[in-house]
Every structure is written in structure tokens, then in C-alpha cells.
């Protein structure tokens, strides 16, 4: 039986632990809060996230990373993107020599503009054949209640991708494989920024035409950056590109969209940060993404305006006006 460690017990980590167990793995979920671990072991629920969803008996929890990682052949990482490097400094020495790291994170490291798989490779000292990325339209709440969904498992190693695919294939989650790790990660990171903009539109009271235009043009700037970095353009038409973008921009379950909606209603960045418990990755990813784009001469006007709203105090309506007043041009350009 496959043994998986999932770190940590946030909403997506908890749900993915359920997925792995439903697919037949023995799972140890690391919860920093011992009370959460005790509740999972005693009542089979995570009382902080998804308290009404029963976890399988194959899911056990611990507040000890050493116990969680002992004998694990899959190490699933579900932590805030900006905390990943410091977490791996502590955890990587506890990981077995043949274990595969699986990233559930969709963000970019501030300062370095590195993708999560790059941070794992550097901080844990492992090759790309031991790293996989899971990305797609995967709102945790919907998967928790077993609404049918699909996802992508990307790895530089076909064997690794297929192994992780088999480990998370259930009657309600259908995983596909992809060799384009860069494209899958980039799609997940940029869509969080676009979802912030989608929330702003909702908060300002705009309608379906506005949202559809934003999603489509957001996909265009994602593809421009991805192509410049060497990603496969087809990736952005798939689950890790368009699929993730549609789900995150359109659902009230999306924390990035919810965050943006509050900005659109007039709250400041500091006010929303103080109110919203869960991490909105797009807030921290927009600047690293822009640094990448600027270095390559790639235009990302939506991401630029989101950054201005977040960090320069630009009113969201002014950001919309700026986007709409840009010089017209062809729809397709690289």
C-alpha cells in the first residue's frame, strides 16, 4: 500500500489527503495544531476546514513532521507559497531518499520569481524526476463533497507523473498527465492574479461580458508569458490553464476572487488582509510574475493593474478605465 504524507492540514491539503485515501493510500496528515490532529484522529473531521466532511479511516493526523514523513513515498506539499522554502529546510532532511514531492501550490516565490517546483528542487536538493505538480480546476470544497472534477499531474518524468496519477484517481477526480511542468505551474500562478481582478469586477457590479472579457484576455497574457519562458502553448488551453482560470474567476469558493471582490467594494489591501483568514496567493504572486514578464519584455496589462490596485492604492475602477483606454490592437500577438 502506498504511504503518503500531506503537509499541511489546510483546506486543500485536507481534501487531497481524502482523495489519496479514497484511491487506496495510507495517509498521514500533518497539522501544526495538535487539537486539529486529535479531532481528525478521533472524529475523522478537520474542525477548522470542512468540518462537515468525514475523512476516510485511512487518513491519520499528527502534529509531528517526523511522524508524518516516516516511510512516506509521496510527500504532498500544501503550504503558502512564500513559506515553502523555510518549511523544506525543516522537512527535507526527514524525507526518504526515493520519495516523490508533490506540489499542490499555485504561486511564485517573492524575490526570486521561482516556481514552486524550482523551490522544491533547490531547497530539498532533488532532481526534477522526483517532483510532480497537481494543478487544475480544483476548488477544495467541491472535491471534498465529491463533485466530478479533473486535474493535471505534471512532471518531467513520465513514470513519476503516472505514479502520482494512479495515486489520486478516484470516481470523483480524474487526473491527466502532462510533461509541461512550467506551463502548468505558470497557469496556476497567473490565474490567481486574474481571479483577483475578477473579484474586483464582481465587487464593482459589472456583469458577464466584463468577466468573460477578463478571463479571455487574462488567458492571453498567461500564454504570452508562458510561451516566452518555453512552455507548451497547448497547456494553457487545458485544465491547468483555461480550466483553472474559469473555475477560480467564476466561483465564490475561490479565495482570490473573494479577496478581489472586497477590494472592488472599496476595502483597502490592509483591511482585507486583516479580515480574510485563508491565503490569497495572487496577492503575493503578482510582483514576481511582473518581474519575470518585464525581464522578457512581455506585456501583462491586467497583472500590472492588479499590482497597482494592491500596492499603489489605485482604485479598481481607475484600473478598469486604464485597461479600456489602452491603444487598440490585434487580438492575437506574442
From Swiss-Prot:
GO MF: glycerol-3-phosphate dehydrogenase [NAD(P)+] activity; NAD binding
Matching InterPro entries: 6-PGluconate_DH-like_C_sf (IPR008927), 6PGD_dom2 (IPR013328), G3P_DH_NAD-dep (IPR006168), G3P_DH_NAD-dep_C (IPR006109), G3P_DH_NAD-dep_N (IPR011128), NAD(P)-bd_dom_sf (IPR036291)
Main location: cytoplasm
Binding site for NADPH: 11-12, 32, 106, 140, 255, 279, 281
EC code: 1.1.1.94
Annotated Gene Ontology cellular component terms: cytosol
Compartment(s): Cytoplasm
Active site annotation, chain numbering: 191
UniProt keywords, alphabetically: Cytoplasm, Lipid biosynthesis, Lipid metabolism, NAD, NADP, Nucleotide-binding, Oxidoreductase, Phospholipid biosynthesis, Phospholipid metabolism
UniProt-annotated binding residues for sn-glycerol 3-phosphate: 106, 136, 191, 244, 254-256
Catalysed reactions, as listed in the record: sn-glycerol 3-phosphate + NAD(+) = dihydroxyacetone phosphate + NADH + H(+); sn-glycerol 3-phosphate + NADP(+) = dihydroxyacetone phosphate + NADPH + H(+)
Pfam families associated with the record: NAD_Gly3P_dh_C (PF07479), NAD_Gly3P_dh_N (PF01210)
The keyword Transport belongs to this UniProt entry's keyword annotation: no
PROSITE patterns: NAD_G3PDH (PS00957)
BP-aspect Gene Ontology terms: carbohydrate metabolic process; glycerol-3-phosphate biosynthetic process; glycerol-3-phosphate catabolic process; glycerophospholipid metabolic process; phospholipid biosynthetic process
Pathway: Membrane lipid metabolism; glycerophospholipid metabolism
Enzyme class: oxidoreductase
Family to which this protein belongs: Belongs to the NAD-dependent glycerol-3-phosphate dehydrogenase family.
Function: Catalyzes the reduction of the glycolytic intermediate dihydroxyacetone phosphate (DHAP) to sn-glycerol 3-phosphate (G3P), the key precursor for phospholipid synthesis.
Protein name stated in the entry: Glycerol-3-phosphate dehydrogenase [NAD(P)+]
Native source organism of the sequence: Parafrankia sp. (strain EAN1pec)
Gene: gpsA
Amino acid at each position: 500500500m502506498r504511504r503518503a504524507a500531506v503537509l499541511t492540514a489546510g483546506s486543500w491539503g485536507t481534501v487531497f489527503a481524502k482523495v489519496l485515501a479514497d484511491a487506496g493510500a495510507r495517509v498521514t496528515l500533518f497539522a501544526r495544531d495538535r487539537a486539529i490532529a486529535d479531532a481528525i484522529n478521533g472524529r475523522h473531521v478537520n474542525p477548522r476546514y470542512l468540518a462537515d466532511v468525514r475523512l476516510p479511516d485511512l487518513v491519520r493526523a499528527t502534529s509531528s513532521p517526523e511522524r508524518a514523513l516516516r516511510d512516506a513515498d509521496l510527500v504532498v506539499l500544501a503550504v503558502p507559497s512564500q513559506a515553502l522554502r523555510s518549511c523544506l529546510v525543516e522537512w527535507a532532511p526527514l524525507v526518504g531518499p526515493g520519495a516523490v514531492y508533490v506540489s499542490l501550490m499555485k504561486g511564485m516565490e517573492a524575490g526570486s520569481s521561482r516556481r514552486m517546483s524550482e523551490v522544491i528542487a533547490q531547497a530539498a536538493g532533488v532532481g526534477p524526476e522526483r517532483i510532480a505538480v497537481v494543478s487544475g480546476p480544483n476548488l477544495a470544497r467541491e472535491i471534498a463533497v465529491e463533485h466530478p472534477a479533473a486535474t493535471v499531474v505534471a512532471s518531467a518524468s513520465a513514470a513519476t507523473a503516472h505514479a502520482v496519477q494512479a495515486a489520486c484517481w478516484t470516481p470523483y477526480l480524474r487526473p491527466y498527465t502532462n510533461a509541461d511542468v512550467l506551463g502548468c505551474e505558470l497557469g496556476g500562478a497567473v490565474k490567481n492574479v486574474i481571479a483577483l481582478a475578477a473579484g474586483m469586477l464582481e465587487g464593482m457590479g459589472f456583469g458577464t461580458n466584463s468577466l468573460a472579457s477578463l478571463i479571455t484576455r487574462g488567458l492571453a497574457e498567461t500564454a504570452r508569458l508562458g510561451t516566452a519562458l518555453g512552455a507548451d502553448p497547448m497547456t494553457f488551453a487545458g485544465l491547468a490553464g483555461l480550466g483553472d482560470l474559469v473555475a477560480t474567476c467564476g466561483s465564490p469558493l475561490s479565495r482570490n476572487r473573494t479577496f478581489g471582490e472586497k477590494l472592488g467594494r472599496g476595502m483597502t489591501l490592509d483591511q482585507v488582509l486583516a479580515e480574510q483568514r485563508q491565503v490569497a496567493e495572487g496577492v503575493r504572486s503578482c510582483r514576481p510574475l511582473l518581474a519575470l514578464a518585464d525581464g522578457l519584455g512581455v506585456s501583462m496589462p491586467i497583472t500590472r493593474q492588479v499590482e497597482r490596485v494592491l500596492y499603489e492604492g489605485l482604485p479598481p475602477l481607475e484600473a478598469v478605465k486604464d485597461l479600456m483606454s489602452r491603444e487598440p490592437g490585434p487580438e492575437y500577438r506574442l
